[in-house]
Amino acid sequence: MCTRVATLLVGLICLILVPLGVQGKDAPVHIGFLVDNLKLERWQRDAKMIQARAHELGAEITVKDAGGSDDLQLQQANQLLDDGANVLIVVAHDAEKAAAIVQAAQRKGVPVISYDRLIKNSPVSLYISFDSVQVGKLQASHLLSIATTGNYFLLEGSPSDNNAHDVEKGQKLALRQAEDKSLITIIDEAWCRQWSKKEGYDATVEALKKSDGKLAAIVAANDETAGGAVQALAERKLAGKVLVSGQDADLPAIVRIIRGTQAMTVYKPLGPLAKRAVDAAVALARGNTPETTDKVSSGSHIIPAILLQPIAVDQKDLGATVISDGFHSAEEIKKALNPGEWEKFTSRKR
């Protein structure tokens, strides 16, 4: 009798010591993928790749689109946890408010991966992204290599997104020396909460008024805001005359690069990012520790991280990057252009 009671007690203690969300070695894994806003082409691509990798590994996955709402994203997280998700991958809408998602997951012993946007002041299990400071450096240094003097306008992402601040940091690091030498002047800076085309347009209209149309370059944080900037420039017949950067290698941005109205974009190969995120999610759900490359501070905690390197892309690099990787096919780009534009572009490159 005593032996039986002791055995039961040992078993109970073992159950208590195992985190609630952790699965056995071969147990099925249910991944919850919480996305800020699936209206953006960038997140649509991530979602498809993450789903595909999860299926390859035999994991169940549920994707939730918050549509840019913090409250909805928290509701969706709680629903996924109630439905038995044993690991969450989160693209946070607000880096601070998403801490509530981590707290909810902790209560159920479920690990959380911050995907491409670091959740602030929270003990997330892993942060996986591209080096956002390097993104900003690539954007600004590329424009500065062409427009070595003149007025610069910084068009940033969301003030609630840690990545946006890192991108801004990289931009300013790249521009600092030229600014200190009075070669360039940063005439204004605007933040776009939704990283949207409309916000980019509105902010650029104001910058053009403030500078009386005298801009050398617009360091736009992503391709959506860049699209708005180019639209505002076009209305003043300045598209192609004022340099514009971007990020994400969205198809409309590739079209603008070919047409010469956007100088460059920063390409982030999403396949490796999605693969490593899902692989790490499955490992964490099974109680294992994924391999990492870096450590970052969330403000309150030091977080293990996987940081991949971004790539600057302009007209001369399209074939060797986004096309050769299959991110966009030549046929897809050709269809997005007007008749004859692709042929003219490719013949010019020969």
What spans do the regions from the language model cover?
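Bacterial N-terminal signal peptides
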Residues: 7-19
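A residue-level marker of the well-folded mature domains of exported/periplasmic proteins
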Residues: 23-350
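N-terminal secretory signal peptides that target proteins for export/translocation
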Residues: 1-3
